[in-house]
Amino acid sequence: MFNSVNLGNFCSPSRKERGADFGERGSCTSNLYLPSCTYYVPEFSTVSSFLPQAPSRQISYPYSAQVPPVREVSYGLEPSGKWHHRNSYSSCYAAADELMHRECLPPSTVTEILMKNEGSYGGHHHPSAPHAAPAGFYSSVNKNSVLPQAFDRFFDNAYCGGGDAPAEPPCSGKGEAKGEPEAPPASGLASRAEAGAEAEAEEENTNPSSSGSSHSATKEPAKGAAPNAPRTRKKRCPYSKFQIRELEREFFFNVYINKEKRLQLSRMLNLTDRQVKIWFQNRRMKEKKLSRDRLQYFSGNPLL
């Protein structure tokens, strides 16, 4: 009934045909990236290393001489020229050895030096310690054990007369200077007491009718006031004519002055605010007294 149909036309091309077709196209595009291709992994083991083990020319670094070597010595065993912690006994012993070699001191004095400096390293220092050390030790060892030797002269000036050395002349001079002024006040007090006694004698002569109780009462304050300094009255500072004229002019217009005007006057007259305030208070009291005197004079009434 049906004509025979060649199914090969409807089927996909065979594997051989596809391979031939792919080979033709692959020759054209051999240098293109194909997803189905595997990646090439080179073998670097066969290639020689870039830096040989024994280079023919040594590379010199310019900063190699400036880099300090690695410190393998402990901190306590370093030479005593460096600054150390105050509780490191190893530095104390190193300092003693260096001093012994420098000053050529016998071994017996080294123990004295260690005992002398034990307080400065251990923290238990007594200025009046009986241990003695040779004079050469103080010439080479710092007096402060922290700062360099150049700072010893400052410690000599600051702590004069302290510890082992005798008192220096500047300190003794200061003590003498302090002790000398103490004598004049005694003589001055004596003269003041004599002057007070003379004044009391004059009062007795002028007032013979005064009772004994009042005399003793006046004598006790005199004795108590003798040791104290005499009360000197504050020196009066009179105002100049220009200041008085300006103050009187302001008082003529305003008997009571406000704060702003008071500050203005104090700046203009080179006075303090308190001086202007007190002057106006005194001037008001004076004006009150003058007005009362005028009223008494014109009225003829003495009771006013």
From Swiss-Prot:
Domain of life: Eukaryota
Sorted UniProt keywords: Developmental protein, DNA-binding, Homeobox, Isopeptide bond, Nucleus, Transcription, Transcription regulation, Ubl conjugation
GO MF annotation terms: DNA-binding transcription activator activity, RNA polymerase II-specific; RNA polymerase II cis-regulatory region sequence-specific DNA binding
InterPro entries: DUF3528, HD, HD_metazoa, Homeobox_CS, Homeodomain-like_sf
PROSITE patterns: HOMEOBOX_1 (PS00027), HOMEOBOX_2 (PS50071)
Subcellular location(s) per record: Nucleus
Main location: nucleus
Any one Gene Ontology BP term: organ induction
Record feature DNA-binding region, as residue ranges: 232-291
Per UniProt, location of the Glycyl lysine isopeptide (Lys-Gly) (interchain with G-Cter in SUMO2) cross-link in this chain: K82, K116, K178
A GO-annotated cellular component: cytosol
Region named Disordered: 167-237
Free-text function comment from the UniProt entry: Sequence-specific transcription factor which is part of a developmental regulatory system that provides cells with specific positional identities on the anterior-posterior axis.
Family per record: Belongs to the Abd-B homeobox family.
Protein name: Homeobox protein Hox-C11
Biological source species: Mus musculus
Upper lineage: Eukaryota, Metazoa, Chordata, Craniata, Vertebrata
Gene name per UniProt: Hoxc11
